[in-house]
C-alpha cells in the first residue's frame, strides 16, 4: 500500500497543479509533513526544514494547509508517531503512513506548493512538525525570511516553473501516473505527501531500510514516475530518497535535525547569501532560487526536484556535509548563484556519486546515518550527523548523505541504487550537468536564457517525462526523470553541461523525435559543445537509463533489496561512469568553479567503485545509438539541403525528385495558361476594338445613307427603319432597309432612284460584307486579326462608298428632276421584284407618315443622331417652306 500510495501520491503530485503546489508546499510544508511523518525521527530535520519551510509556509499563509496536512498525516497516519514508530512502520505501516503522508504532503503541496519551492516540501516531509515548529520558532524570523526569500526567489521562477513544470509533470504524471491517478487525486496527493515522509520514515527505519527501500523504491518508482512533477517527484522521490533520508533517522534525520538546524541557520544566511551552500535547504532554496532565477520554469522544477532531494536529503545530509561542502561545495556550488543549481547538480551528483561512489557506503552510511538519524531525531542529529557526517562531512558526508538520500532511500536496496544509479546517473548527470549548469546558471540565471532552454527543456522534459512514464515503474525512473527534469530545468546550463554525455545516454536509450530534433540542434554542438545537448541528452539519458535500467529495476528493486548494491552499482557505474566521464569532462570545463566538488570526484570513485562492467556495453550501445542518430540527422540535413521546395524537403528523397519534376511541368502549364490568357485578353480587346470600329462604320454608313437620301424624305425613313430593324437583325434589317429605301426612292423621283439604286446596291453589299466580318468576329475570336484586316479593307471600301455616295448625292441634286432614272428603276426593281411589289401597298402609309414626320428635313443631311434631326424644330421649320413644293410633288408622284 505504501508503494501504491506513494506512487499514487507521486502521480498526483506529478500533476502540474500538484507539482507546483507540492514543490511550494514542500517548501512551506516541510515541518508539517515532517512532524506528522517523523514524530521523532523527522523532528530533528524538521527544525531546519520547519525554519525554512515553516517560515515560508507561514509567510505565505500556506502553513495552515501544511498543518492540516499534518493533521491528516498525524491523524490518519501512524507515521506522526516517533521515528521509531516510523521505523517500525516503515515497512508495514509506512505504506499507509506514506500514503497518508503523501496525502498530507500533497495537500500541503496543494495549499503551499505554489508558494513554497520543492525544497521546503521535502524538508517538511522530512521534518517532524514539532521539530519544524521548534525550528520555525527558533529560526522562523530569520529562517523564514531566508526560506521566504529563497521561496520568493524560487517563487519568481516558480511561477514560470509552475507552468513548465506543471506541463512536464502533467505529461509525466499523465504518462507515468495514469494507472495510479484514477484513484482520488487528493488521496494520492495526500499520500504522495505522506509517502515521502513515510518513505523518509521508512528510510529512517533503516534497519528495515532494505524493505523500506523496496517500498520506497516502489514509492519512489511511483514518485520517480511522477518525478516529472519535479517538486513532488523529487520531493517525494527525493522525499523517498531525500525526504526519506531526511525524515528517516537513518540518513537525513540524524543529519537533518542538525543539518536542518544548520540549514535553517545557514539557510538564513545561505538563503540570504547563496554562496552559503551549507544549508541544503537554503541550497535548495538557492537552487530553487538560482535555478528558478536562471531557469524560472524548468530550472525551478528541476530545482524543486533538486531542492526536494537536496532539501530533503541534501539539507539534512548535506547540511553538515554541505556546510562543509558549502565551504567547499558552496564555494563550488555557491561559487555563483547558478552554483546552487550547480550545487544541486553537484549535490545530486555528489549524492549520486556518493550513492554510486559509496555504492556500499549508502548501506554503511545509511546505517550510520540511520543511527545518526535516530540520534538526530533526538536532535542529536546535527551533532550525530556532524559526528557521522564529519568523517564524510566535507563532501564525502554530503555525498554519503546524498548517496543515502538517493541510496538512503534506496541505499540498502541498491535496487534503489539502480534507480538511484539511474537517478544518480541522472542526478549526477542532472546535477553534474547542473553543476555545469550551475556555472551556466550564472549566465543561465537570467530568465531569458532559461526561457530559451525551457522550451527545449519542456520538450525535453516532456520527453523526459515520457521517458519517465516509460520508466514510471522504476524509482530510478523517477530519479532519472527528476534528474532529467533538473537537467532540463537547470536547464540550459545542464544541456550545456553534459549534453554529450547525455546524448550518448540519449542515443543508446531512446531515439525520440524530439531528441532527434534536439540533437539536430545539438548534434554538432554535442560533439563540439556537449553541454548544448545536455538537456536533450539528459532527457534521452534519463529515458535511456530508465529504459535500460528500468526493466531491471522492478525485479532488481526487490532483488536489490536483497542484493542491494550488486547490480545497481554496475548500472550506476554505467550511467555514472558515462555521466562521470562526460560530467567530469563537462565539469572540468564547467565545474571548474567546483573542482573540489565531491560530485566531480566521487562519480568517478563511485563508478570505479561499483565497477564499469556494464558501462562498456552501455557505452557501446550509447555510441551506436549516437552514431545512428548522427547518420539520421545527416540524412535529414541532406534531404533538407537537397530538397528545393519546402514540400519536397518534408518528403523523403524519392518523393522529392518526383515532387520537383512535376513542379516544372506545372510551371510550364501555368506559363502556357498565363500566355493563353494574355492572348485571350488581347484578342478580346481586339474584338472589342473591331466591334467599336464596326459600330462607328455603321453609324457612318447611316449618315451616308441619310446624306445620300437628303433630297428625299424616304431616306430618313429608311434610316429610322434601319435603326429600328437593326436591333432585330443587323443584316436582314439592313437589307430590308435598303429595299424599303429603294422602293421609296422608286416611289419618289425615278431619276433620283435611278441614280441612287446602284449606290444602294453597292452600299448594301458593302454593308453585308461588314456584317459578315462582324459575325465572324463574334463567332470566331481567333480570326480577329484577319477580321481586323477585313475591317480595314471594309473601311477602305466604306470610304470609297462614302465618296461614291457623295458623288451620287451631288448627282442626285443635279439630276433630281431628270426622267432618265425610270429605266434604272425598272432594272433595280427586277432584282428586288417581289419585295418591291409586296411592300408597295404599305408605301402610301409610309409616305404619309414620312410626310408628316420628316416635313422640313428635306435636302439637309442629318448632323448627328437621326432623332435630333427628326425632332429638331429648326430643321423642320427651316426646310419646311423650302421643300414644301418639292415634298408635295413627291407626294403626288407617290400617290
UniProtKB/Swiss-Prot annotation:
Keywords: Coiled coil. Residues 131-142 have a biased composition (Basic and acidic residues). Belongs to the CCSER family. Residues 83-102, 348-358 have a biased composition (Polar residues). Residues 1-142, 154-177, 332-394, 459-497, 731-753 are annotated as: Disordered. Residues 43-56 have a biased composition (Low complexity). It comes from the Eukaryota. It comes from Mus musculus. This is Serine-rich coiled-coil domain-containing protein 1. The gene is Ccser1. Residues 675-705 form a coiled coil. Transmembrane segments: none annotated.
